[in-house]
Amino acid sequence: MHDESRTKQISSIKALLKKWEHEYVHTNNCKPSKEDVKKQPEIALLYKQYYELKRESSITPKKAKTKVDFKFQTPTKQRAETEANESPKAPRNDYLQVTPKTVDKSLLGPTPQLSRRVLNLLEDMSPIADSHVDQISDIKHNTSEISSTMIPTTPSKNPEPVAQHTPTVLETPSSYRLQVYTSPNLLRVNAPCRKSLSEMLRELKDIEDDYGSNEEKILQEFESFSSSSSESLVDRDISQPMKKKIKRQNRLVKLPPSMNLSKSHLEGLPEIDEDAENGIDDNEDTTASKDSSPFLDLQSERQNKKIMRNGLVIGKQVSQNYSSYKLKKRKFRRHRS
């Protein structure tokens, strides 16, 4: 109900303010500013009321806490409720609340008394010990305990019997006595075996003498092998020098021998007339019939036929402008590419 009355009041004040704003715009042709509102106190009061009511309505009311039913929850530890500003209490001194009978005898109050009996100041008082002496004795006691526990000793299976005093006649002389340790002294560190510089140099020289000869032999063999290999390489280079050839840039084609068709081979031959040739033939026939020697005929034919020039066989010359040729057989044939 309170909210409804507030909303009604806000709407009524808003209507009055809007009415005044419209009138002001109609008369002055501009909206009112803050200074114009302050000049009219009634309108300023209405604005103030309007903004206060608006702010109160915008605040949301807090929700009321609802009580939780603890029947359906696990039990929790109940802590004592203490206020936040409450400081913790100081611890109480129990000696102030104790009766004199139960008071510790070592406790002395303002007046020295023990079980309601006044004490003398020098009674039951122990002398003050020096703190420095106590510290030294504690240190010695601790070091003795540490030294006894540092050396580990194993328990012996057959414990030695209690030593009894033997007569001096049966005792071993002191020169032959040896001290036997039951357990090794782990704290003692054996010093490493040290050598002098001269001994180390002597050992190095002995090692060099032993192994130096072998090294020299190996070096000589290696040098001889390297020199022989270099000489062989030099000889091979001299005997077979490497030459860089230009790569062939044209196609290799094998052609047959060129035929020289010029008649230069006929220049040295004598001219033969047909009449003389016929007459020579007649004479040859008569001489052949007379001599009847076939060997001479074959020899004359070879002389006439086998005149070789530029691969051509020349026969008998018929005339000055004509000569017979016989081509030799070719040894290879040109393949077409």
UniProtKB/Swiss-Prot annotation:
One record GO biological process: double-strand break repair via break-induced replication
Subunit structure: Interacts with rad4.
Superkingdom field: Eukaryota
Family membership noted in the UniProt record: Belongs to the SLD2 family.
Subcellular compartments: Cytoplasm; Nucleus
Job description of the protein: Has a role in the initiation of DNA replication. Required at S-phase checkpoint.
Chief location bin: cytoplasm
Effect of residue 154 to A: Decrease in phosphorylation by cdc2; no interaction with rad4
Positions of modified residues (Phosphothreonine): 60, 74, 99, 154
Gene name for this UniProt entry: drc1
Protein name (Swiss-Prot/TrEMBL): DNA replication regulator sld2
InterPro entries tied to this protein: DNA_rep_checkpnt_protein, Sld2
Single GO cellular component term: DNA replication preinitiation complex
